[in-house]
Amino acid sequence: MRIWNRVAVAAAVAAGLAVVGGTAGAAPVPAAAPKGSCKLVTVREAGTVLGSPVGAGKQKTGSAGGVTGDRCVWSAKKKGTGGLKGKPLELEVVVESGSALAASYQREKAEDPLEADDVAGLGDEAFIKDLKLHVMVGERVLSVALHNYRYPKPLTEQQIQQKEEDAAKLAVGRLKPS
């Protein structure tokens, strides 16, 4: 599905919107933090996660339905790396904030509990649904997804989830104040 068409976590989690960032030693990060989703994962780190060199991340910001968001997408320089001819494997990181975000996150998770698997050790809580990872970090939701891949070959469901978790660990570490 296209990012701007999907409404995950009740118009929040994967709508392709908000970013929240923080720096070590800084005061707690407010719900609507400065822009910079592309700063949550470096180009080198994105390339490591995808297993292929990537270009600079492309950032988009916006807001809808009371949710503010920032999205960054890194694309493999070589097309076809995810198994789809002519398409670059992509890593997407989205950070969203808004007053109704926590309730929306919980609704999305509870909507189909058999399809949402909890993921331990990320943020305040995390789940993966439809091969998209969603992490609650304070009052923000970080979503990570790969795009333009084929599975089970060349990528298995476990490999996709691991790549998303690896990227989320990097991003969450940069979101949380120390």
What are these regions (language model features)?
Residues 38-53:
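Amphipathic alpha-helical segments
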Residues 26-33, 113-178:
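A short, solvent-exposed beta-edge/loop patch
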